[in-house]
Amino acid sequence: MTPTVTSTSIDDDRPLLELLATAPDAERFAFVTDGEGAVGWGVAARIAVGTGPDRFARARDGLRAFSGSDEVVAFASFTFDEDEDGSVLVVPRTMLLRRDGETRRITVGGTDDGGGGEADEGADAAPLPDRTPLDRPRYAGSTVRDDVWLDTVAGAVDAIDTGSLEKVVLARDLHLWSRTPFDVDRLLLDLAGRFPACHTFRVDG
């Protein structure tokens, strides 16, 4: 069954992430660079990609139902290790796309609303919700000690310099705590404001 897709132009030049913050209470997604890109909320389709070497093929097959529209955007987050769980591929029920200064609202029919209902309310007309003061976050360290982390980074740099390694992805966790809940919407707005040329994205994988 081919989902129904509707597209309308909206007259609102506020930042996409600010518009997302006014959206109905539902699962939210974002990928924004230099003020343009896509945000979405609600779930029209959640595609199970699983693990293993065929997960990207399963993702491609799952998106074929939406191939009739060039405005539908899927938000994805794939694990680096193909054997690890946690990869996500979602088509939001409602999306706002901004290209070359024009903003369009895309609504996709589906069966799983992800708590977002039809999600066709006017986020383009709603004000930003009031924000309660935030507590300063405290850093509580990582499960990887600083000296071990620095040695790992230095080893990777040496391997690249000697030509035994061309590319490496290093990551470690960082624990934070706060007396007030973390406000993801505000965090995204701050990140995009401070680093507009970087990709600011939100996918809960």
Listing of model-derived features with the role each one plays in the protein:
Residues 1-205:
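Signature of the chorismate-utilizing enzyme
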